[in-house]
Amino acid sequence: MLIFFQNLESQEVNGYDLVEIEGVSTVVVESESFRENRASYCKQRSNPNEVIWAEEFSSGKLDKEIWDYDVSNGFYDKGKFVYGWGNSELQYYRKGKTDQNTNENLFIENGLLKIQPIHHRRAFQKEFDYTSARIKTRNLKQFTYPSKITFCFKAPTGTGAWPAFWLMPEENIAWPQGGEIDIMEAKGRLTNIAGSAIHFGEGFHNKDEIVQNVVIPPSVRFQEKFHSITMEWREDSIQIFLDSESKPYMTVKSDDEVFSKFSYPFNRNYYLIINVAVGGKYDDHRINRTAFCLNSKCSNKDNPDDHRFLIDWIEYARLEP
């Protein structure tokens, strides 16, 4: 589904038009670079002297010293298992099982990390119709401020696909007291919209969030071209940028009014998570079963990569305070 924004009533923020699409505040980005037909609109890489760590996916192996897998369809909270990861998600996340530390749902090919949800005709473990992959750097690689985190990606198409690139606190702390930073998440149903969000508060039923989407022209949609999203992270502030844009489409500061009720939790160490969920609350449980791969080769699709979350590179670099 394409969203056309030319005739939407708008306001302005940071020089961008601000509209509301499906009830969500959405920044309209019409970059000069979009006038050129490119395979990738990702920003230029940082000066090597500024780079703390980078992931190029240049070998076929997922580095076990950096990446670990989440496995299952949920988690334990106070001794009780929470199915669907708290979001009514349908997929079962599988572990790496080869010498390459990959599996049918996650592999590295041609310098790209590829994550593909698979719809199983016979339920996986007799219970789950979908499998996928979710990797994390917890206890292996930490991220903190002042820094900038950038990743270059192409989103998967298909209603029900939910790719995400996000941060959670390294310490053991009840969600969302330590905060959650969703640098990028997208709905497979919406081809030219991606979003960012932060979550914070005292508990599951006593919390708040800030959500900001970004919409781009149909000619450069997130599901057909590579784009980058960068989070610039300083003490007491977060700014998020699309591609090579000099202005952020999302800005959060500790003195924003929303933090008068809940404390600002984002001055701490976090770990990185990359995953593709299936279904769930994010797109109101919408799902199109025919949109998904049916096997590891995705042989039921003419262009398998269209149905995979593709990541070209990740960069973690120094930033002046």
Residue ranges and their predicted role:
Residues 1-10:
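Classical Sec-dependent N-terminal signal peptides that target proteins to the secretory pathway
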Residues 12-321:
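GH16 jelly-roll
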